[in-house]
């Protein structure tokens, strides 16, 4: 079922002073906001534009999942949040809702709303976790630690909701060994689905300045390209529990926004084919390095 990325216009506590100012060092909202979300319009209008957008590219469907991607989509008062969620779920072609948010922006009151909606709709929460290492989270000005993510995931799963996590591969200070070792902590979260994507350095971000000042702290510097990333992703998959569905391995953003992207313009579907081919060559599968089979 096709997901429709939408923008509810909500901000982030790491930008407005709720947690901090300036946002995460790597973040540029424009990089993952589809063109049909720009220029305003109600959520219902965005949905219609999104459906037309995908139909024009041959992606037809009877029903869709609304995906609140941009911003922190639990960061408002409960009345506003209920209005947003119900507007999306009332669309005749929407069969479910995925809410992207931060692990420090969930409460019992919000979980009550989501649990109630889940009785008649598919509801999932996707947390931007980004790293399992507190030193990294602090360095990128994330505004929360990994324990916060552990707690948020556990509370959300206790309500019977599907929970996903988003992680960035290649944040400063993390080696290949750190990334693979961190999969043990990810597995302990017992996520229903997961997204990985490579660090892309966006123009005008704080991390762009950091990259130019000390690129040796980034694994994507010094010749780490598509072959090396393919091998790393295959190793991640082999250490990842097969009970967690992988939704993404690579991101793609408009080129004019990117200052540095070591993987060039390879598309996610092309990269997925490359990874599957490499795993086949290795006679490998998800979780085989940890001896876990899918339930």
Which residues does each predicted region cover?
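Conserved C-terminal portion of the radical SAM core fold
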Residues: 147-207, 227-249
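Structural recognition of alpha->loop->beta junctions
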Residues: 24, 89-94, 181-196, 269-286
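Distinct, well-ordered alpha-helical segments
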Residues: 78-86, 107-116, 177-179
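Hydrophobic faces of well-ordered beta-strands that scaffold small-molecule active sites
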Residues: 2-6, 64-66, 97-99, 123-127, ...
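Core AdoMet radical
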Residues: 30-50, 54-78, 93-106, 122-149, ...
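Canonical Radical SAM [4Fe-4S] cluster-binding loop centered on the CxxxCxxC motif
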Residues: 1-45
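Auxiliary Fe-S-binding modules of radical SAM enzymes
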Residues: 1-2, 201-295
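Acidic (Asp/Glu)-rich catalytic clusters
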Residues: 54-58, 85-92, 112-122, 154-158
């Amino acid at each position: 079922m096709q997901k429709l990325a939408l923008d509810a216009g909500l901000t982030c506590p790491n930008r407005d002073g709720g947690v901090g100012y300036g946002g995460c060092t790597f973040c540029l909202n424009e990089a993952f906001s589809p063109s049909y979300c720009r220029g305003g319009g109600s959520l219902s209008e965005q949905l219609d534009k999104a459906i037309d957008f995908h139909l024009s590219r041959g992606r037809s469907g009877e029903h869709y999942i609304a995906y609140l991607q941009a911003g922190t989509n639990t960061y408002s008062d409960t009345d506003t949040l209920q209005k947003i969620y119900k507007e999306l779920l009332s669309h005749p072609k929407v069969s479910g809702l995925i809410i992207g948010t931060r692990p420090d922006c969930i409460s019992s009151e919000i979980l009550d709303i989501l649990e109630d909606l889940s009785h008649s709709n598919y509801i999932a929460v996707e947390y931007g976790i980004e790293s399992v290492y507190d030193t990294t989270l602090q360095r990128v000005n994330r505004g929360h630690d990994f324990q916060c993510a552990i707690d948020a995931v556990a509370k959300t799963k206790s309500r019977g909701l599907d929970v996903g996590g988003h992680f960035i591969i290649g944040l400063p200070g993390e080696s290949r060994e750190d990334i693979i070792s961190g999969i043990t902590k990810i597995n302990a979260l017992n996520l229903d689905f997961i997204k990985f994507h490579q660090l892309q350095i966006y123009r005008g971000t704080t991390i762009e300045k950091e990259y130019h000042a000390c690129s040796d702290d980034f694994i994507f510097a010094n010749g780490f390209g598509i072959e090396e990333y393919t091998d790393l992703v295959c190793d991640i998959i082999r250490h990842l529990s097969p009970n967690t569905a992988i939704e993404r391995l690579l991101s793609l953003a408009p080129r004019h926004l990117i200052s540095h992207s070591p993987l060039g313009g390879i598309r996610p579907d092309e990269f997925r084919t490359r990874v599957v081919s490499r795993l086949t060559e290795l006679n490998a599968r998800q979780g085989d390095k940890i001896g876990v089979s899918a339930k």
